[in-house]
């Protein structure tokens, strides 16, 4: 049985959180590692855009984002444009699923669970 290691990281720049996630993803993929992870943290203002994202969905251009102190990152995750801001709780689950094709149902189930407990 896999164990869930939950870590509260406080305020962490997106770039640092991304490096940590990539390292943990590599670790979780190892057969001998019994741990999955849930990283809980917050970022300063940042916008990310996923592989299927459309930059036309951004309301500000790169100069305007920079003027407002909002970082911008293109990521290899799915999805479109996402904003994270100071004070917003963010959870990054890094979990080895038995069936990698079931990522979307897993995410939907996680979202539903969090909404039931009003998070």
Q: Locations of the language-model features?
A:
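N-terminal lobe of the biotin/lipoate ligase/transferase fold
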Residues: 1-115
